[in-house]
């Protein structure tokens, strides 16, 4: 989950649907999402709710995301919402956030990444 804060409530609904269908769901958020309180919600509350839904700690740092590749932790990585900033970083191989590191680490195993862009660019 990236910092498209106005879409977090819809992303959380989707997370609940994913968790209802799959036993093991690992939540991953950008550092900014993990720390920023906005008019759309409190970061601490969002992290707590993600842990409740997934029954798994939230990955929110590059260091925590790095083992995803070597340990082959995921079958599918969903980035929802994916900001334009994160999308640009992914397109250019920039891995300076927990989400972009998770994607790079996951892709190195030839496994799929599903991206749900959320931008206000039209």
Language-model features, listed with the residues they occupy:
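A cross-family phosphate/adenosyl-ligand binding-site feature
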Residues: 1-122
